[in-house]
Amino acid sequence: MYGRGPMWDNRIRNGIPTPPVTGTSSLQYFLDRLAAGVSLPVEGHVLLVHECALKADGVRAARAALKEPYLAICPLSNLFIHNTLPSIPLMRESGIPICVGTDSLSSNDELNMVAELRAVQEAYDVPLGELLGWACLNGARFLGKEDILGTLEPGKKPGIVHIKNLADGKLTEASESVLL
């Protein structure tokens, strides 16, 4: 965020273009760039991914600039790259819908949604039902597919996954998913 450190030095040494150093968060940089190109607030769903540096002012700025923001977290990638998770309590308090993903194998050892959810549950006291809503319904809503995906209801055709090896409603190291 400040234009220093080994990654920055490596980019300079190798002639790789460097992003502008603004001293602001990536979210604020994105919102500032967005405001320079379009009228705010932006209509439609906008997915804000990772947001490990999210603070209350970022939530306020996102709500002001975006009519329908969504947050996407990839917990194991966040831990792999930043050795931290985003502020899940702040995200929950914000009222902005949270989605969960796996990111990619370039920043993760496996693509395993149960492991992603378990990483959140190990760090924060988030009920399993809420986590499943982030993983299923919120993703379907973001994609505009909640009429056919995201929940088990008449007329919908979601994939069905059974999560085995729970302990008192919590995910465990032994928890795994089985596609039904």
Could you describe each region identified by the protein language model?
Residues 1, 165-167:
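Short beta->alpha transition motifs characteristic of CBS
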Residues 1-70, 82-98, 147:
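Histidine/acidic residue-rich metal-binding segments in metalloenzymes
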Residues 40, 84-165:
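His/Asp/Glu-enriched, well-ordered alpha-helical/loop segment
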Residues 51-54, 76-78, 103-105:
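Active-site beta-loop-alpha junctions enriched in small/polar residues
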Residues 71-75, 99-102:
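Short beta-strands and strand-loop turn motifs
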Residues 76-81, 131:
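A generic structural motif
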Residues 167-174:
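Short, Lys/Arg- and Gly-enriched loop/turn segments at beta-strand edges
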Residues 178-180:
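Short peripheral tails and domain-boundary helices/loops at the edges of structured domains
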